[in-house]
Amino acid sequence: MRIWTLGAKVPDLDREIAFVQALGGELVLDDLIPFEGEDFRVPLLRLGDKYLHIAERMVYEERLRRPLDFGLCHVVFEIDDLTAAREAALAAGASEIAPVTRVSAGFGTRDVAFLRSPGGILFELVRILENAVPALP
């Protein structure tokens, strides 16, 4: 398991992209991600050796008790065995936000699960089936 990216909710995607680029970051993908019948614009930015996904509304946000505040909102873990990682997280006290879903977009194809830790950390487990994102340095 490793951290693949962080997710952040922002009020203005284009303004945030320009800000990150002004800091030396790079727009890797400006992607539309289909999830539960809706398309979400979720640009992927690279800053040094890390990725950052940004969105004006997170794909799982409708399933939460209240809307997310702006700022960092979840961490994405890349894993090899999604079933085992999800079961381990649930057994350790995590709650499921959205069931395992297959998502295909500009980044490739992934199986994803959205969960919340007992302490409230929102996280995503991702099994990459096809990767179309450039490797980090």
Task: Cite the ranges covered by each PLM segment.
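Short, conserved charged micro-motifs
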Residues: R15-I17, L82-E87
